[in-house]
Regions:
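A structural signal for short secondary-structure junctions
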Residues: 6-7, 93, 110-115, 135, ...
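Cofactor-binding beta-sheet edge motifs in enzyme active sites
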Residues: 72, 76-84, 112, 116-119, ...
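PLP-dependent enzyme catalytic core of the Aspartate aminotransferase-like
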Residues: 125, 129, 133-136, 146-176
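Hydrophobic, well-ordered secondary-structure elements that form the walls
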Residues: 12, 91, 119, 134, ...
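Conserved PLP-binding catalytic core of the aspartate aminotransferase-like
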Residues: 106-137
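Active-site C-terminal subdomain of aminotransferase-like
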Residues: 2-105, 109-112
């Protein structure tokens, strides 16, 4: 629901047990019913925030990011449970597709464990050179990590054609 914004503000979605919910830092938006019986969204569990009980606050949020919370709430409401599930399935499916395309292009996955939409590969070429080539071709490539590794990520917005082209560029740089 929120586009990237040069490092922030941003937010994420999470699930937790009742026992743990008051231990979570940050602002949490919850669904409720207003006095007219209409569905609405509010900043919930506010007792732990700095502006209510500063001495027990578990977060350092000092500025209001309510617009982000509102945007995310509208997005989640519009998506519904099935829509959000579909987005998650697309992210996972596309990440696994890209990992296999990159494996075929010469990169080796570092971990053989279940993953959602991010994964790490070893890169036989200079990661800075690969990143420069990808940027030159209009890709915000993987994140170079220490030791010649790269963190890759997909979302529901990535197309098969984009991932195929990315793998071709990787093969061009890494296996030339």
């Amino acid at each position: 629901g929120l586009p990237m914004a040069f490092g922030g503000p941003y937010l994420g979605f999470m699930a937790t047990t009742r026992d743990m919910m008051r231990k979570l830092p940050g602002r949490i938006v919850g669904e409720t019913v207003d006095s007219d019986g209409k569905r609405g969204f509010v900043l919930t569990l506010q007792a732990r925030e700095q502006h209510i009980r500063r001495e027990k606050a578990s977060s350092n949020i000092c500025s209001n990011r309510a617009l982000c919370a509102l945007t995310a709430s509208v997005y989640l409401s519009a998506m519904g449970p099935e829509g959000l599930r579909e987005v998650a399935l697309q992210c996972t499916s596309k990440a696994h597709y890209l990992r296999e395309k990159l494996r075929a292009a010469g990169l080796s996955p570092v971990y053989d464990k279940p993953f959602f939409h991010e994964f790490v590969t070893d890169c036989p070429a200079d990661t800075a050179r690969l990143s420069a080539k990808l940027e030159e071709e209009g890709y915000l490539g993987g994140l170079p990590l220490p030791g010649g590794r790269i963190l890759w990520c997909t979302t529901e917005m990535n197309t098969k054609e984009e991932m195929d082209r990315l793998a071709d560029l990787v093969k061009e740089v890494c296996c030339a």
